[in-house]
């Protein structure tokens, strides 16, 4: 990053903010080609940011900012396997997991392509064996249910993907257990049979407390129903700790590895995606990878002015840093993407929720926004009130497919799309006091009532939103969408000048929880804890004593 040039562009963008479009209605009225000017496509994916308060000057300044931040250099370093995760001295190469082409991928001078393909082939063989019934349970019955036990990136990605690709399921049912709360695994197991259930334990070190606690509960459940000798037929692992996996009772040919150059929240493309592959089959899983690789190539080669991840990141940075918007709402008008907001919470907030720059100095601008959302139209009947009339402006990101998977329900899909477009239009246009009054008078309301109620029906408008449209949520398109958001996070992290690939905030909580466990169990005193923690522990013990 050229800090001097970056500061110059930052100042220019701040000065420009007051000259950017203040009224989106007027901006569209003044420029009939505004939609064409502020949309970009890649295949059937379309990104429309024309309803955001930007103009040609804004985009030009943002492109210059990206140049000052050396976005192209950072991007090249990532794809080349340079150790851009500086706090852990690691390369960042989740993109290698979906690069099935003939080109090699180098880490520390070694081509890792063969290892990636070897794991993928092993996953495919195992998935086919489970799906076909070649690999049976201990009593000779076919596996009908898969339970993935993991947390964070070992759960959110595959759980989201399994739901997103539901129309392509032709394998065993997939379930996900992540929470240390015993209710999660209890409720999951309640409807399953040990004879026909396979557990996948996803933990790189095989020491993650939440995951291993749930795995031990699952093993006890299998042993109680089928005996200790059955464990090997009902478990698989995604891990690199082969000794601990063997000690647990999982056979070596059921262990699938991954590498430290793949961060947890970027790991769905490899062995962590095993439950997805079993559910939808290796062919559909590879289509998912192919779509992501296509987006990788687009991100690497498309000029900035038409580069979807770069544009999404530039506009996101503009909203966060220059406009000062604290959050972004992700609203998929696609029910099967209902877990996308939760997935993006980890992808974005764990990556860019940082307070120091790459050189360890405090950041001088805001960094990652709060990310949240729910699927449309559900959100319209919950929190859209705040989006339309609340005191905070929150940029909204709409996602929608032109075609659904249920042709017999086309009318419902049309209603879904109409609602999506209407919300986007309403956020942009709003409704003036005069318009509210005219509408109420036209309905025959008394003037006195109109005077009283009209102010409550005013919408300021000018609330930014962008829309991502695609033809249909198939495996390839889904892969492209997720890779699009991954690279968007990278772009924003580059502009923030932070390390988007560590997560020390996660580690702190783990450390403290380890020390607090014996205190909660009553084995150690809480005397050396702060007054609040001490008081809460005492109250827990009191409440338990009342049982």
Swiss-Prot record:
Keywords: Cytoplasm, Gluconeogenesis, Glycolysis, Isomerase
Protein location: Cytoplasm
Documented EC number(s): 5.3.1.9
Catalysed reaction equations from the record: alpha-D-glucose 6-phosphate = beta-D-fructose 6-phosphate
Main location (coarse class): cytoplasm
Gene3D superfamilies xref list: 1.10.1390.10, Glucose-6-phosphate isomerase like protein, domain 1
A UniProt-annotated Pfam family: PGI
One Gene Ontology term, aspect cellular component: cytosol
Superkingdom as given in the UniProt entry: Bacteria
Function: Catalyzes the reversible isomerization of glucose-6-phosphate to fructose-6-phosphate.
The name this protein goes by in its record: Glucose-6-phosphate isomerase
Source organism of the structure: Mesorhizobium japonicum (strain LMG 29417 / CECT 9101 / MAFF 303099) (Mesorhizobium loti (strain MAFF 303099))
Lineage per the UniProt record: Bacteria, Pseudomonadati, Pseudomonadota, Alphaproteobacteria, Hyphomicrobiales
């Amino acid at each position: 990053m050229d800090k001097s040039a970056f500061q110059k562009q930052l100042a220019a963008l701040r000065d420009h903010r007051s000259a950017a479009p203040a009224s989106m209605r007027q901006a569209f009225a003044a420029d009939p080609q505004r939609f064409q000017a502020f949309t970009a496509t890649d295949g059937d994916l379309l990104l429309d940011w024309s309803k955001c308060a930007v103009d040609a000057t804004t985009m030009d300044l943002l492109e210059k900012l990206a140049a000052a931040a050396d976005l192209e250099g950072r991007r090249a370093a990532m794809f080349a396997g340079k150790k851009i995760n500086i706090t852990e001295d690691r390369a960042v190469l989740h993109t290698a997991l979906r690069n099935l082409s003939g080109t090699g991928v180098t880490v520390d001078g070694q081509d890792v392509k063969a290892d990636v393909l070897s794991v993928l082939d092993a996953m495919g063989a195992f998935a086919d064996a489970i799906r076909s019934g070649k690999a049976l349970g201990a009593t000779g019955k076919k596996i009908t249910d898969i339970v993935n036990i993991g947390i964070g990136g070992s759960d959110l990605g595959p759980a989201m993907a399994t739901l997103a690709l539901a129309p392509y399921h032709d394998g065993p049912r997939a379930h996900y257990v992540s929470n240390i709360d015993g209710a999660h695994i209890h409720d999951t197991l309640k409807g399953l049979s040990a004879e026909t259930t396979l557990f996948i334990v996803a933990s790189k070190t095989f020491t993650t407390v939440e995951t291993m606690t749930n795995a031990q509960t699952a093993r006890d459940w299998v042993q109680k129903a089928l005996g200790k000798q059955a464990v090997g037929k009902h478990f698989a692992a995604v891990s690199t700790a082969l000794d601990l996996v063997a000690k647990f009772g999982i056979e070596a040919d059921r262990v699938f590895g991954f590498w430290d150059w793949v961060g947890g929240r970027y790991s769905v493309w490899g062995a962590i995606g095993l439950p997805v592959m079993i559910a939808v089959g290796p062919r559909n899983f590879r289509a998912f990878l192919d779509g992501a690789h296509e987006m990788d190539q687009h991100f690497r080669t498309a000029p900035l002015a038409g580069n979807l991840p770069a544009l999404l990141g530039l506009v996101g940075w503009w909203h966060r840093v220059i406009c000062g918007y604290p959050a972004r709402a992700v609203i998929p008008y696609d029910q099967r993407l209902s877990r996308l907001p939760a997935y993006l919470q980890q992808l974005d907030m764990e990556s860019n929720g940082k307070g120091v720059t790459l050189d360890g100095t405090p950041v001088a601008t805001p960094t990652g926004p709060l990310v949240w959302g729910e699927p449309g139209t559900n959100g319209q009947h919950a929190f859209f009130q705040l989006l339309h009339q609340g005191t905070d402006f929150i940029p909204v990101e709409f996602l929608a497919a032109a075609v659904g998977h249920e042709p017999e329900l086309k009318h419902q899909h049309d209603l879904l799309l109409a609602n999506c477009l209407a919300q986007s239009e309403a956020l942009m246009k709003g409704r003036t006091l005069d318009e509210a009054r005219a509408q109420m008078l036209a309905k025959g309301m008394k003037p006195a009532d109109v005077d009283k109620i009209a102010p409550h029906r005013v919408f300021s408008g000018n609330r930014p939103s962008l829309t991502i449209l695609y033809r249909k949520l198939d495996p390839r398109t889904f892969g492209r969408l997720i890779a699009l958001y991954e690279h968007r996070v990278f772009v924003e992290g580059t502009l923030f000048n932070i390390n988007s690939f560590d997560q020390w905030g996660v580690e702190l909580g783990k450390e403290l929880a380890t020390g607090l466990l014996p205190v909660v169990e009553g084995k150690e005193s809480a005397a050396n804890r702060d007054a609040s923690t001490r008081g809460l522990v005492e109250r827990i013990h009191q409440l338990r004593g009342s049982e």
